[in-house]
Swiss-Prot record:
One of its GO terms (biological process) is negative regulation of transcription by RNA polymerase II. InterPro entries: Sds3. It holds the Pfam family Sds3. This is Breast cancer metastasis-suppressor 1-like protein-A. The gene is brms1la. Residues 16-51 have a biased composition (Acidic residues). It comes from Danio rerio (Zebrafish). The keyword Ribonucleoprotein does not apply.
C-alpha cells in the first residue's frame, strides 16, 4: 500500500508539470499581449494552487485508507493463523492429529516387538533356571546316596571292630572271671558269719625271692586283666586273627596309582567304559571321569555322576570290568 501512494504522488506531479508546460506554452504564445492579460494570469495561478492542495489532500486520504486496510488485513491474517494453530493443538491434545498418530503407531509397534522379545527371553530364563534346579537336585541326591553308603560302610566297619574287640575281651576275661567269682564268694561267706571269731592268718614261709603284694584283690584283678589284654594284643593269636580278618575283608585287590586304577589284575584309566555290578542290582554302564587316591568318579549313560571308594572295591561290595 505505500507503493500505491508513491505512484499516486508521482502521477500528481506529472499532471502538475504538464499543466505548467501548457501554461508556459500559452504564455509564450501570448507574450505580445502580456500586458493586457496580467489580471487573467493571476487568477489562473490561484486556481492551480488550490487544485494542487486539493489533490494533495486526496492523496493523503487515500494513503491513510490504504494503510488502514493493510492493518486490517494483517490483523485478520494473524487471527486466522492463530485459529489454525489452536485447532491443531486441540487435535494433538485429543489424539487426532496426523503428526501425532503416525509416530504413536510406530512407538506401539516397537513396544509390541520388545514385549514379544521380552516374553521369549523370560521363557528361556525360566527353562534355564528349571534345568539348573533339576541338575542341582540330582547332584545333591547322588551325593546323599554316596555319602549314605560311605557312612553305612564306616559304621559297619566300626561296629565289626567293636564286636571283635569285645570278643577278644571276653576270651581274655574268662581266665580271670574264676578269681573274680572266688573273691565274691569269699565276701559272701564273710557276710554270712558276722559273729564268727577272726582267725589269725599264719605267716607264710617263702623260700627264695618273692614278691609282697600290697594291693587289694580288686586292684590285682584289674592289673591282671590289663596284662592279659596286652598279651592277647601282642601275641601270635592276635596276629593270626588280624591277618585272617584282613583277608576276609579284602576279597579283591584294588588300588590307585598315578591316576589309574588297578583292580583284579587289570588297569583302568580315565575315559574308559566300564560295567559296574552290585549285589542284588542290575549292572550299570558308565565311563570313568576321575581317579583319585581313594575314590573313582564315573558318569552314567543318563549323565549323572557318582563315585566308588577303593575300599568298596576291595571288600567286594562293587565289582567293575571293562565294557
Amino acid at each position: 500500500m505505500p507503493v500505491h501512494s508513491r505512484e499516486k504522488k508521482e502521477s500528481n506531479h506529472e499532471e502538475m508539470e504538464v499543466d505548467f508546460a501548457e501554461q508556459e506554452g500559452s504564455s509564450s504564445e501570448d507574450e505580445d499581449t502580456e500586458s493586457s492579460s496580467v489580471s487573467e494570469d493571476g487568477e489562473s495561478s490561484e486556481m492551480d494552487d488550490e487544485d494542487c492542495e486539493r489533490r494533495r489532500m486526496e492523496c493523503i486520504d487515500e494513503m491513510t485508507n490504504l494503510e488502514k486496510q493493510f492493518t486490517d488485513l494483517k490483523d485478520q491474517l494473524y487471527k486466522e493463523r492463530l485459529n489454525q494453530v489452536d485447532a491443531k493443538l486441540q487435535e494433538v491434545m485429543s489424539g487426532k492429529a496426523a503428526e501425532y498418530l503416525e509416530p504413536l503407531a510406530t512407538l506401539q509397534e516397537n513396544m509390541q516387538i520388545r514385549t514379544k522379545v521380552a516374553g521369549i527371553y523370560r521363557e528361556l530364563c525360566l527353562e534355564s533356571v528349571k534345568n539348573k534346579y533339576d541338575c542341582e537336585t540330582q547332584a545333591a541326591f547322588q551325593h546323599w546316596e554316596s555319602e549314605k553308603l560311605l557312612l553305612f560302610d564306616t559304621v559297619q566297619t566300626e561296629l565289626e571292630e567293636k564286636i571283635r574287640r569285645l570278643e577278644e575281651d571276653r576270651h581274655s576275661i574268662d581266665i580271670t572271671s574264676e578269681l573274680w567269682n572266688d573273691e565274691l564268694q569269699s565276701r559272701k561267706n564273710k557276710k554270712k558269719d558276722p559273729f564268727s571269731p577272726d582267725k589269725k592268718k599264719k605267716p607264710v614261709v617263702v623260700s627264695g625271692p618273692y614278691i609282697v603284694y600290697m594291693l587289694q584283690d580288686l586292684d590285682i584283678l584289674e592289673d591282671w586283666t590289663a596284662i592279659r589284654k596286652a598279651m592277647a594284643t601282642l601275641g601270635p593269636h592276635r596276629v593270626k586273627t588280624d591277618a585272617s580278618s584282613k583277608i576276609d575283608k579284602l576279597q579283591h585287590n584294588a588300588r590307585s596309582e598315578d591316576g589309574r586304577l588297578f583292580y583284579d589284575g587289570e588297569w583302568y584309566s580315565r575315559g574308559q567304559a566300564i560295567t559296574i555290578d552290585k549285589k542284588d542290582e542290575y549292572p550299570t554302564s558308565a565311563v570313568i571321569t576321575t581317579i583319585n587316591h581313594d575314590e573313582v568318579w564315573f558318569k552314567r549313560v543318563d549323565g549323572s555322576k557318582s563315585k566308588l571308594y577303593v575300599s568298596q572295591l576291595q571288600k567286594g561290595k562293587y565289582t567293575v570290568k571293562h565294557a
